[in-house]
Amino acid sequence: MRRPIMRRALSAALLLAAVAPALPARAAGPGWPDTYLSRVEATAVVQSLNAALLASRSATATLEGWCAAHRMAEAPRLVARLDRGVDKPASPETRKRLAVGPDEPLRYRRVRLACGDHVLSEADNWYVPSRLTPEMNRVLETTDTPFGRAVAALGTTRQTVGAEPHWQPLPEGWDQAAPPAPSCGTLDVPEHLFSHRAVLFTGERQPFSEVVETYTRAVLDFRRAPRPADPACPKP
């Protein structure tokens, strides 16, 4: 029963993704006025991406599909911008989820996943090199290939072990209050929208990686079509 439910969640997420926002910096951009409707749309867009990621086997493939569907880059292909020379020891909980002892070597990889000029997520990744092929290890150590693409031959599946929202576009009590009057300001969006912690498994259900993915406001970097209800504001 789980796969049909996941497919329905993904289909619903991709349909909802058609509602759209705009640009980064400190405000979301001219396409995102700070209005009640805009906040409802932002909520739908963020939650649709969240649902698509939770239902997916590969965050890399999902983000590439998001970038392509929203025309965010001429070549919608994800690239991992590596932060080289950094290390972060795995916690005992991570080692337990990966089914490795305290002396088993783990490798750490921190990347920013970008589509064109848009950094869509930041990822901290701990993986067990002995459970990958030599070629996979070489690719991960020497190239900017996203992790999901590098290990795709393992028949990867994901199990989410934690999810945390970092932004709620609608104010507390919005469902019981009258909507505020629209204004000519732009919607302020924080740097980070939500994060997931997931364990990756081979096709034989052997855990080989744990990743913490934090999704940024750049996922909203696409053109939001004007709405009839948008306030008539002077051009900046």
Give residue spans per PLM region:
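Bacterial N-terminal signal peptides that target proteins for export
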Residues: 2-12
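Low-complexity, intrinsically disordered short peptide segments enriched in small/polar/basic residues
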Residues: 2-3, 16, 50, 77
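Intrinsically disordered, low-complexity segments enriched in proline/serine/threonine
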Residues: 6, 23-26
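Bacterial N-terminal signal peptides
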Residues: 11-21
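N-terminal domain-onset segments
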Residues: 26-108, 112-114, 118-179, 184-194, ...
